[in-house]
Every structure is written in C-alpha cells, then in structure tokens.
Amino acid sequence: MELDAILDNLSDEEQIELLELLEEEENYRNTHLLYEFAPYSKQREFIDAGHDYPERCFMAGNQLGKSFTGAAEVAFHLTGRYPGTKGYPADGKYGGEWKGKRFYEPVVFWIGGETNETVTKTTQRILCGRIEENDEPGYGSIPKEDIISWKKSPFFPNLVDHLLVKHHTADGVEDGISICYFKPYSQGRARWQGDTIHGVWFDEEPPYSIYGEGLTRTNKYGQFSILTFTPLMGMSDVVTKFLKNPSKSQKVVNMTIYDAEHYTDEQKEQIIASYPEHEREARARGIPTMGSGRIFQIPEETIKCQPFECPDHFYVIDAQDFGWNHPQAHIQLWWDKDADVFYLARVWKKSENTAVQAWGAVKSWANKIPVAWPHDGHQHEKGGGEQLKTQYADAGFSMLPDHATFPDGGNSVESGISELRDLMLEGRFKVFNTCEPFFEEFRLYHRDENGKIVKTNDDVLDATRYGYMMRRFARMMRDIRKPKEKKIPAPIRPVRRGR
C-alpha cells in the first residue's frame, strides 16, 4: 500500500505520529551508516586480509568503493563495534562475523589524504559526513552516538583536526576513548613524525617518505597500515614496493569496475568508454600504467569467455605451482586439438595449505587428470621428508612422472610466456570469466627496469605455463569419464590334428 493511501486512512494525530516515527528511523539510519555497510567480495577480501597482513594496499579503479571500505574498517577499529560482537546490531548488513584485524583496546588512528581540501571532501566526509551542511560530525561511518567531541582545524574551512570516539569491548561495554586525527600529505613529512599510534589509513597514494613515517608510528603495536587508491601515478615508489618487492607482511588486493555491484553492465561499459584511453586501465581496473614493462598488453575482454561443459573430444591436463608462504596454484587446461584452441577452465589458489587440503579443494575436478608440476617438486621437506611431488601423489593427485619441460627438454620461462601471448593474440587461448585469480595476475605481470620478469604474484600464470608445456600428456575427456575397458581375448582352443 502506498504511503499516501495509508495516510488517508489515519487520523491527523496518527499521521503526525507515523511521520515522526519515519523521520526518527531515517535520522537513525543517517547517523549509523556503519551498520549499512555490506561489503562486496573484493572489499571483504581486503578487510579479511588484515588478519594476516600488517600492510595492505587496496588498488582499485575510480568510484568503486575503495574509500568507503577504508572508512568502514577504520570506524570499526575506532568504536570496537566489530560485526559479530554485542556492540554491533543484529540487523546490521555486514553479513557474517569480522575476520580481519581486531584491536582489543581504544586506538589512535591517523587518516591521510593529499591536501586539506581532499581530506575534507573525501576521508572526512565519509567518516564524519559533511560538516558544512550539518555543523557537526556524526553523519558518516562513525556512529553519531559514539562521537564524544571534535575539534576544527585552523588550516582549512570545515576541516576536522581530530575526533574523540567511544570504544567498546566485544560485550558492547564502553571501555575508553579512541582518537582519530586527519593529516594531509601536503604539510610535509615533519607533520608525520613523533607520535605513537595503532594504525594509519592512507587514502590516495602518499609520497613514499610519508608512507614510511606513518607506518613507523605504528611499530609499537605491531604495525598497521591500509592504503586505498587508484594508481594514476603508474609504477611509483609505493606501487613498486608492493608489486615488485613485497615483504611477507604486505598484501595487494585489486578491484576492477567489474567487481563493483552497484553498476549495471551497460553503465560499466559507458564509464570505461568515457575515460581517456591511456587512463582506462588505472581508472577502471586499478592497474598501474607500466608502459612497455607490462608483459600481457592485451585487453582481457579479448581472451575472456563464458564457462561451458567440457566436450568429450577435448584433451585435459591439470598443472600446479607449489607454495606455502606464497600461494600454491592449481589449474585445469582444456585443448581442442581440432581447432588448436586452449581454454583455462578452472583455477584454485591458496597459501599455507597442505597437499591433503589442496586435494580436498580440487578433487571434484582434478580426479584422474594428469598433473604437470615444476622442478621444485623434487625438493624434500626440511628435515629430509618426502619429495613435494610424492606428497601430492599420495594425497590423490595424478602427478606426471617428470617435471614440466617442453618436448625438447627445455623449460624457458620466456619461451612459455611468448607462446602463450602469441596464442592470446591469435584468439587461440581463452580463459573462463570465472577464473579471476588468473586475471589478477595477468593484469600486473611485468618486467623490471632491466627487462627481467618480476617473479611475484605469478602462481596461476606459472601453473598455466606448466600445463601448456606438458600438453602432450593431456588425456581425452571421453577416456577420463568412461575409461576404456580392457578386452581379454578369448582363450585359444587347441587345434586337433588328423592322424
């Protein structure tokens, strides 16, 4: 029933009461936006990664929700109202419990942005609301009821210097005061020195010196930094550190316009077309401009295809790249010999999983299919344990007898990459659009300033290369589904000879 029809059936007093209730509900929603945050899968992946990685980089295109993600996470830390705790409402829209980094005490956070103006219009607006409209914070990600007090900055109109925020335990009990400071990069490195804080959020890419200073301020509490930005400056020092020389504490999550659920397919294509061609990769896909350094300078739409059932006459091979601290990867490659076209149909990638765990994850599609593997499969566990290859064979994988090589015995990375790239350009290498881990690596695979391939974040690509190199051992899907029955010849009857 429409609101007007409902109102017509109510007395004047009832109408006033109903409108007051609706107004009260809207006001509550506007001052508790944190509870409306329902992360997309990429946003959730970034937040969850905080459990294992002190330094995280959310590299995303424009207007995809990266700053809202950063603001929501900071608000959860400032208030302690993590999803799944008593401080978070049962009807909140987060969906599931909090799996990311968790602080168990009131925190001090620094929020960084490029200038006083951009801080006011972006991070501060998302965390606090528009001060120029409301004359007070409380209309952003930080619930209004949790803001104790705030102080304006003398450096720019409506810029907040800092906020005092109520912090809560997992039982929803207030246990102290968190502090949130806003800091622009434009004030220089000196303004980023001297304090001890729990965490720092850099929205838009900071100069490397300021990134280092901000991170250093968090050393006492184990280090904590998050970056959310569109990489319009290409392979800057910060981007280079995370992509080319990452430490074990660093994690990059890439989000493209195709991961944003608030746009229709038509809107996505319209937005991409509106960007200057040389900026499309950065603005739509969050991919830094790498110039001639990027290896696959091929539009990913030209190699993407819809998933389909594997025909009986296709040949199939699986392949894997071993890993523990960095992810291991398992892929499945289909080969249509008639058309000489390859399809990457399945991908699985995960860190710190044993051979048995990996088999449990891929058994449904890897059973009885030959598996190509790299030369490090000959290595033994520390302390003289089994070879890696043997561990995976024991778990259930149909490991090929020898490690991956070309038919001539070579295993050149350059040769493998070159052949795969040529197949892509000729339209003879396709990837199911469900294989997102492949595309995440495909977008960022590059060479360094000396022309050498940077061997980071390449687990799926390596596995794909191994499968392609060993395609001569692929099995026809018909034989995998319906193994040939061994026909036992009839016994030979003795021939009677005449006397």
From Swiss-Prot:
It comes from the Viruses. The terminase large subunit acts as an ATP driven molecular motor necessary for viral DNA translocation into empty capsids and as an endonuclease that cuts the viral genome to initiate and to end a packaging reaction. The terminase lies at a unique vertex of the procapsid and is composed of two subunits, a small terminase subunit involved in viral DNA recognition (packaging 'pac' sequence), and a large terminase subunit possessing endonucleolytic and ATPase activities. Both terminase subunits heterooligomerize and are docked on the portal protein to form the packaging machine. Its cofactor is Mg(2+). A motif (Walker A motif) lies at residues 60-67. The gene is 2. Residues 1-58 are annotated as: Interaction with the terminase small subunit. Disulfide bonds: none annotated. This is Terminase, large subunit. Belongs to the Lederbergvirus large terminase family. It holds the Pfam family Terminase_6C. Keywords: ATP-binding, Endonuclease, Hydrolase, Late protein, Magnesium, Metal-binding, Nuclease, Nucleotide-binding, Viral genome packaging, Viral release from host cell. It comes from Salmonella phage P22.
